[in-house]
Amino acid sequence: MLSDWTSIELATRLRTMNRILDCIVPDPPTEAVDDAIEIVLKAVGRQEMTQAVTILEEVVNTNPFWLRGYLLLATIYQYVQYADQAIVTIEKGLAICASGLRLFSAPKWIEAVERINGPVVHNRIRNHAERLRRYERMFRHRLAMLQVRCGNLDEAIEQWSAIEEVHGA
């Protein structure tokens, strides 16, 4: 009975997370990703966590820049008491954010963008960089909370410091 309640709670949390992320950091709509999320939610509802994890891992491995997938996957790992795997997943998402942000701040990239004479292009690039920064903050926050739960207080403080540093910049 308790496991039924937990799977319903997890499915509700994943669905709610997905809706909130649609508002905060909307992804371009793709039928394949929407279908994958629906299949994952149904699998969680049936308590088939292995299937849900496998599907999310496949989608993230196919498209490593689908940052939402890392958050959803880490949430499932956290609910099935695999905190270490949740941490690894969040760290992977954080690494993807960092590589994207490095790309946007590279001198050659900035020079190339400055030569483009179009406000629409500049706007899209700024929006994408802001989207990466939002995900980075979410990943760092989530990682800090997971580190606290695991008793890794030094690592948690490191993440909180990085969050403060980003907000101060």
Task: Name every feature range the model reports, one short phrase each.
Residues N18-D35, I125-E136:
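TPR-adjacent "capping" and linker segments in tetratricopeptide-repeat scaffold/adaptor proteins
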